[in-house]
Amino acid sequence: MTHLLQDKIIVRQFDVQPYEPVSLAMHNFTDRRDDKTPDEIWLVQHPRVFTQGQAGKAEHVLMPGDIPVIQSDRGGQVTYHGPGQQVMYVLIDLKRRKLGVRQLVTAIENTVIGTLAHFHIDAHARPDAPGVYVGERKICSLGLRIRKGCSFHGLALNIAMDLSPFLRINPCGYAGMEMTQISDLVPGVTLDDTAPVLVNTFLLLVGYSAPEFIPWNLDVQGEPLPG
């Protein structure tokens, strides 16, 4: 059973979902899972929202205006989510996969770097600032939480979105940090083009061989419902 669980991962594909119900669902899933629960990946977009991580400081939220600011228990500082950005949450039993937190962060960063390489974009990670960058511009944000030896939260990759709300914050606590996205570098690339590459690159890097893809939605209490 353990060997089969190590191979298996469920990939849930959501439509656009408000941040808070998805966050609640991640907490519920992590609290309820046991050593027989398969790992999961959740693919989702969020309506416009700023999320403030555990290390977040109020002074990095400059002019939120009409965009809500929600406190999150992920690592890191403030970032922005909106339509056209692919969020990928990774709910993984790290002990079962024999992964350390730093190894998972590196795998996520390399997943994004590999995905961007598929579209002929040269990207890199930085030791001083988590995430993925193209030149000096940030294209992907990263924030995790570990509970019971299991990860949740994940990455947010800018694909084809309105980047202007990032000007209302200091992204990830860095004043003047410029953002970029795939469609500005390779016009015409969409979320539908990117998501399969992102998922398959992650599965290959982390070593899952038996993915199961399921379209799902959430109810208002943050409980998954079949899509």
UniProtKB/Swiss-Prot annotation:
Disulfide bonds: none annotated. Belongs to the LipB family. InterPro entries: aa-tRNA-synth_II/BPL/LPL, BPL_LPL_catalytic, Octanoyltransferase, Octanoyltransferase_CS. This is Octanoyltransferase. The gene is lipB. GO terms for cellular component: cytoplasm. Residues 35-210 form the BPL/LPL catalytic domain. GO terms for molecular function: lipoyl(octanoyl) transferase activity. Pathway: Protein modification; protein lipoylation via endogenous pathway; protein N(6)-(lipoyl)lysine from octanoyl-[acyl-carrier-protein]: step 1/2. Substrate binds at R74, G75, G76, Q77, V78, T79, Y80, H81, S141, L142, G143, G154, L155, A156. The record marks K138 as: Lowers pKa of active site Cys. The active site is at C172 (acyl-thioester intermediate). Pfam families: LplA-B_cat (PF21948). Catalyzes the transfer of endogenously produced octanoic acid from octanoyl-acyl-carrier-protein onto the lipoyl domains of lipoate-dependent enzymes. Lipoyl-ACP can also act as a substrate although octanoyl-ACP is likely to be the physiological substrate.
